[in-house]
Amino acid sequence: TFADNMKMPIHKWYRYTAGFSASWVNQLIRQEKTNGRTRIIDPFAGSGTVLLESEFEGVESFGVEAHPYIYKIAKAKLDWNFPADKFKSEALSLLRKAKAKTITKTEFPKLIASCYPIEIIQKLEALKQTWLETEQEEEIKNFNWFIITSILRTTSPIGTAQWQYIQIGRAHV
């Protein structure tokens, strides 16, 4: 199951419940390599499990993901080897700019307003606006988007069900 991935580098960056075990994928890739197969086509790439494991095993891979949100997650994960020091300085710069931004808007869509306190919504909005306004290299911009997306669950006091659906009225425990 994908739950196993939450202990693995890169795979644990995003909890994708529709995914499957990276260890199992790696085992299959190694097995097929012994049969001389060194190319993989994944028509449902999801969050990139097969593509990442292919890269780790030196196997050429191609993936297709139709959902734009999930595609962006996979793309950010596949850029995992971007220089960490450069990313860190860019991410901290983005955060500093967002902290300096004042959001006065208080009206947000009902679903958003029911999932987050107004102070959190305004901070998230500042992050989003700063991200949209900031020019960055594509890999860094994608990864910063990924980080902002990844904190949405933890910044909300609303709980989630097993399949990540929101549960209004249930708090994180």
What are these regions (language model features)?
Residues 36-46:
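Conserved class I S-adenosyl-L-methionine
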Residues 47-59:
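Conserved SAM-binding loop of SAM-dependent methyltransferases across substrates and taxa
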Residues 1-35:
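S-adenosyl-L-methionine
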Residues 56, 60-172:
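Class I S-adenosyl-L-methionine-dependent methyltransferase module
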Residues 1-4, 46, 157, 169-173:
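Short intrinsically disordered, low-complexity coil segments enriched in acidic
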